[in-house]
Amino acid sequence: MPAGEQEREYNEDRKYYSKGVKLVRKKKKIPGYSWGDIKINIIGEKDDSPIHFCDKCDLPIKIYGRIIPCKHAFCYNCANLYDKIGYKICPRCSYPVLRIEEHKRGSVFMCSVVQGCKRTYLSQKSLQAHIKRRHKRARKQVASASLEKLRPHIAPPRTEIAEIPKRLLDRDHLNYIPPEQHTMMSLPSMQQMPHEQHNQPHKDLQVPPPELSPSPPFPIQWETVSVFTRKHGNLIVDHIQNNSDSGAKKPSPPDYYPEYQSQPVVSSPCHIMPQKQHYAPPPSPSSPVNYPMPYPPQDVGTPNLVSSQAPALTTTYDLSLGYIIAQVPPYMNSPPPCAPQSQNGNSSASEFAFHHYNPNFLTQFTENQETLSPQFTQTDATDHRRWPAWKGLPPPPPTWSPPPSTLHGGSHHSYQRRHRPY
């Protein structure tokens, strides 16, 4: 025995140990095969088709026996064995067997997503549909059910919309109501007024003295709406310069109050107040003067159609506050014959007869005349045949002067005078 070589002893499992009972190496000898570093050359092509093992014999399946309708697969011998014995049930799910299909290796795709499913399909598309339908959706449903058990669904509380408090329609509470609500409330409030209230004389048309007239503390739109909600009278208060584009400057209050307090009340559209040193600035073309009527005011683009909707009342100017309180006669639907005609026969200036004409603002008025009536031009405005003399008033025509009862509580109404032929 050569030196350095240890004696070895083999047991029943063909494992050898040293004499000193010290484990040297474990080796399992197979007859006809020798272990070693030997290079093996593989001849052929690699097959990528998966290999499945039968659940009964634990051998790789070469030919599949696919059971219908449960779609479980075994080796063909085991599947036929259970069929021949007479069990007629699937050995995996104990489902009744209708028939057994025979398929070769590589033509069957088995589900391995969930442990224990092992259903087989003949195409990859069918397998993916099965996984999506049976496994992915089931997981989502189970997850949602578990979340509902852990955290049950609580319905959100019903939010109750608080009712808008009913504000008083005075000057102190107008800032709580938007302009849209004023427009909606003005129509029923004016329609519910009796006809007797329209013809009552208005005592609030008098211009206050200069020392008692306060400056307007509220914006223009609030002042306009506050007159809509009044019970007596169909007045509309509008700011003269409510548009920033108008170039006319508002004069100081002391210059105009003595002038207009002493002027008489206009009772006919053919009459024009005597002009003295100062004149009222004409309304800007972009924002014409709104005239009183029992309906909401019209748009800016139609100034000539407004005058046919209100009874005949007076016109008073309050220039310290920047307002015009106007009451339009009811017979402005058709031009009265007292209005002089122009050279071309048009009578458009009769619609503007109740305005104060100011020659100082003629340039500004004619520059923006596109927004007004096209017949109102500079030549027509300066024509002495159209406008009366600046000093003195011509005697009013007896046929067209309205009776005093119409101006102060008469029995004539706006709807009666509107359709009378002239």
Curated annotation (Swiss-Prot):
PROSITE patterns: ZF_RING_1, ZF_RING_2, ZINC_FINGER_C2H2_2. Residues 393-405 have a biased composition (Pro residues). Keywords: Cytoplasm, Metal-binding, Transferase, Ubl conjugation pathway, Zinc, Zinc-finger. Residues 195-205 have a biased composition (Basic and acidic residues). The keyword Magnesium does not apply. Residues 410-422 have a biased composition (Basic residues). Its EC number is 2.3.2.27. One of its GO terms (cellular component) is cytoplasm. It catalyses: S-ubiquitinyl-[E2 ubiquitin-conjugating enzyme]-L-cysteine + [acceptor protein]-L-lysine = [E2 ubiquitin-conjugating enzyme]-L-cysteine + N(6)-ubiquitinyl-[acceptor protein]-L-lysine. One of its GO terms (biological process) is protein ubiquitination. A zinc finger (RING-type) spans 54-94. It is found in: Cytoplasm. PANTHER family: E3 UBIQUITIN-PROTEIN LIGASE CBLL2, E3 UBIQUITIN-PROTEIN LIGASE HAKAI-RELATED. E3 ubiquitin ligase catalyzing the covalent attachment of ubiquitin moieties onto substrate proteins. May operate on tyrosine-phosphorylated SRC substrates. Homodimer. This is E3 ubiquitin-protein ligase CBLL2. It comes from Macaca fascicularis.
